[in-house]
Amino acid sequence: MPQQSILLDRSHQVTTRRRQTLSDLVQHTHHPSPGVRKDAVMGMLELVKTYAGFLELHCAALINAALPLLGDDDVHVRGAVATYFGVLLDRLDDEAFAPFAPSMLLLTTSAMSHISMAVRIDALRVLSLLLDKVPALATEDWESALDAHSGSDRHGQRLLQAFFAMLGVAADAHRQRLG
């Protein structure tokens, strides 16, 4: 069939051992099968590790493709994503990562409030990476997290509120303050 990838000439493209391009892998991050999503993340990691300068050249696509998978329902996909972001954050300088930090913090916060406890716990792994990479942004305005009258909506405040919610602390602290 003409649309089959085996017939495409990829001799001048960067590919994985399975002859998948970044475009193929990005598409596979949306696949219904968790195994395919995990393989897509690991394929993107392979491209980053194999080709010098690939991360810098395709930073936006590499980060944005995996961000929605932070809250994936499959444990293996989340594990691959945490490993993937661990490598990416180690290799990216702060300036290159800065445009993506707010989105990653927001999606990490979202994963921390997921209905599944396993997703919430895995989000803490990513939070740890973010606290190492962008500590000032991640903790910005954290001290007002339990203040019901605070109009602030900073990353630190949201992260701490999500963390307290995971522990069941926020409601108790608020009730004690009221009365």
Regions found by a protein language model. Name each.
Residues 43-47, 84-88, 127:
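Hydrophobic core/packing positions within alpha-helical solenoid repeats
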Residues 1-45:
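N-terminal "cap/leader" segments of large eukaryotic alpha-helical scaffolds
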Residues 7-18, 48-59, 89-101, 129-156, ...:
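Flexible loop/turn segments at the boundaries of HEAT repeats in alpha-solenoid HEAT proteins
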Residues 117-132:
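Internal, conserved structured core segments that host functional sites
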Residues 40, 81-85, 123, 178-179:
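Conserved hydrophobic register position within alpha-solenoid helical repeats
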Residues 24-36, 65-80, 95, 107-119:
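Short coil/turn segments at helix-helix junctions and helix-capping linkers
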Residues 38-42, 60, 79, 121:
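Alpha-solenoid HEAT/ARM repeat scaffold
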